[in-house]
């Protein structure tokens, strides 16, 4: 579960390294974001000479969470970190690569481009 002020690793090659959640989108009272939810992030650390700069504000989709995800078949999946992929205005990934595994729940949230870029889907 990701809430406001949560730090996430950026799991793509846009140049951002660490981002901070500043808003969870999807209703005025929505407090937590799970895998597949869209959030607004501020980039806190970035690689020099990259398209994403420190201080930039972007939309992002959550691809991994430390809090376990319960699936319909009763199994639970959790990851070592909280991670996101930065999106453009059309909610497509800005980067061309996605690092690390992503959760299968992104398919249900219609982020097929993020799933196809990922090296592993769990």
UniProtKB/Swiss-Prot annotation:
PROSITE patterns in the cross-refs: RIBOSOMAL_L14
GO CC annotation, single: cytosolic large ribosomal subunit
Keywords associated with the record: Ribonucleoprotein, Ribosomal protein, RNA-binding, rRNA-binding
GO MF term list: large ribosomal subunit rRNA binding; structural constituent of ribosome
Pfam families: Ribosomal_L14 (PF00238)
SUPFAM superfamilies, per the entry: Ribosomal protein L14 (SSF50193)
SMART domains: Ribosomal_L14
Role according to the record: Binds to 23S rRNA. Forms part of two intersubunit bridges in the 70S ribosome.
Subunit annotation: Part of the 50S ribosomal subunit. Forms a cluster with proteins L3 and L19. In the 70S ribosome, L14 and L19 interact and together make contacts with the 16S rRNA in bridges B5 and B8.
The protein's name in its UniProt record: Large ribosomal subunit protein uL14
Organism from which the protein derives: Borrelia hermsii (strain HS1 / DAH)
Lineage, uppermost ranks: Bacteria, Pseudomonadati, Spirochaetota, Spirochaetia, Spirochaetales
Gene name tied to this protein: rplN
């Amino acid at each position: 579960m990701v809430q406001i002020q949560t730090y996430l690793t950026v799991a793509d090659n846009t140049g951002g390294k660490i981002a901070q959640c500043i808003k969870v989108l999807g209703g005025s009272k929505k407090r937590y974001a799970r895998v597949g939810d869209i959030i607004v992030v501020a980039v806190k650390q970035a690689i020099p000479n990259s398209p994403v700069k420190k201080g930039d504000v972007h939309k992002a989709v959550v691809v991994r969470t430390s809090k376990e995800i319960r699936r319909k078949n009763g199994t639970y999946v959790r990851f070592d970190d909280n991670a996101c992929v930065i999106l453009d205005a059309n909610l497509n990934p800005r980067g061309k690569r996605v690092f690390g595994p992503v959760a299968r729940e992104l398919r249900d949230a219609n982020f097929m481009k993020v799933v196809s870029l990922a090296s592993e889907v769990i």
